[in-house]
């Protein structure tokens, strides 16, 4: 057994336990800052170990490490590190200044990494629950906020239902395939001389339902707006990133691997989910006046675009999805850095109208937000354009012309509410200026703005890494 396959996960878990003990024994009343810095350091160290980790399958065929797993782990670690950085500046204002907060982010990211390396239905579920349980607590971490408690409870109840659907679907697949290993399931389906049993198809549908819930894709999106609005904003930024990357890692690996031989049966379902997510996300965001709710509906639409690559069912489509998720990370983290900076007299303001005149009172922050909004709309030459271009090309090459057409229409509709935010910032009468923001938020917003604007310079290496990751799914 090659234990080095899981060395990044082992190190991250040990770091999490060490930081937890450090926080308990610290004599400071609130060792939040030191624990946050240690958590970011643990993410960086784990990232280096992920890059250096070898390929292989180990631990009795329940854990796999390949180019795809490494790609998704790096995305998840980046999402966790950026969420921790976003928390540092405003932890006291958001009432989350307790050392357990970064530790929970760390263990949630650990679960996301386990999901990316899952090669067995059991590790799939364990990784999913490790990630989800930490997020349930994080959503309700601001105990004095009524909306935070409501968000945590709502996400817990609906998330438990989704986990039950996933577990029931997994049990059906295990019952019909006779094994929990992905390779064994794939062999059972590929060597079957009869039609695919209806019970097995029900199992696939239930698993698909559980995973699309984690993606906030239609029709399992109902929790997203309320939870995004009620949770602490840095938690919302995290939820919009790492957990979705992990769910996509599971979805792509399971659908391309063990269920690849029954692709015609599930592709039509995924295509419908993608269409509905794009249209609903774009249309429902138009009347929103709260920017966190708008970002929630926007994320529903973005997951629809990312699912287009899976609908294609090709390595080109998977590559498009991975590049899209990379660009989504940059845009999402940057936009939430601006949203966290929206404070007046120490109080959080999340109304779109509160951005009025930001171009006059804080032109740097307004310019960064404009970059992220135009990128989410898919305007060239920003990062979001290249992500959409790749998934659209993959859909067209797979002859999914209707899906591609709906994607274009949804992008045009979505452009309206993104441009509306830019209009409010630069052309409306100025509101009272926002509070001075900490250096960490300026660092993240500027860094993400530069990365989003100059993504073309790294498109080649990112696309090559995504291509290698996609090819690993079809070996």
From Swiss-Prot:
Topology of this chain in the membrane: Multi-pass membrane protein
Cellular component annotations (GO), alphabetically ordered: plasma membrane
Residues that span the membrane, as ranges: 5-25, 32-52, 71-91, 99-119, 121-141, 155-175, 193-213, 232-252, 266-286, 294-314, 322-342, 366-386, 389-409, 439-459
Lineage, uppermost ranks: Bacteria, Pseudomonadati, Pseudomonadota, Alphaproteobacteria, Acetobacterales
Protein species of origin: Gluconacetobacter diazotrophicus (strain ATCC 49037 / DSM 5601 / CCUG 37298 / CIP 103539 / LMG 7603 / PAl5)
GO annotation terms (biological process): ATP synthesis coupled electron transport
Family: Belongs to the complex I subunit 2 family.
Main location: membrane
Gene that encodes the chain: nuoN
Subunit structure: NDH-1 is composed of 14 different subunits. Subunits NuoA, H, J, K, L, M, N constitute the membrane sector of the complex.
Protein name per its UniProtKB record: NADH-quinone oxidoreductase subunit N
EC number: 7.1.1.-
InterPro entries associated with the record: NADH-Q_OxRdtase_suN/2, ND/Mrp_TM
Root EC class: translocase
Pfam families: Proton_antipo_M (PF00361)
Compartments where located: Cell inner membrane
GO MF annotation list: NADH dehydrogenase (ubiquinone) activity; NADH:ubiquinone reductase (non-electrogenic) activity; quinone binding
Keywords carried by this UniProt record: Cell inner membrane, Cell membrane, Membrane, NAD, Quinone, Translocase, Transmembrane, Transmembrane helix, Transport, Ubiquinone
NCBIfam families attached to this UniProt entry: NDH_I_N, PRK05777.1-3
Catalysed conversion reaction: a quinone + NADH + 5 H(+)(in) = a quinol + NAD(+) + 4 H(+)(out)
Functional summary from the UniProt entry: NDH-1 shuttles electrons from NADH, via FMN and iron-sulfur (Fe-S) centers, to quinones in the respiratory chain. The immediate electron acceptor for the enzyme in this species is believed to be ubiquinone. Couples the redox reaction to proton translocation (for every two electrons transferred, four hydrogen ions are translocated across the cytoplasmic membrane), and thus conserves the redox energy in a proton gradient.
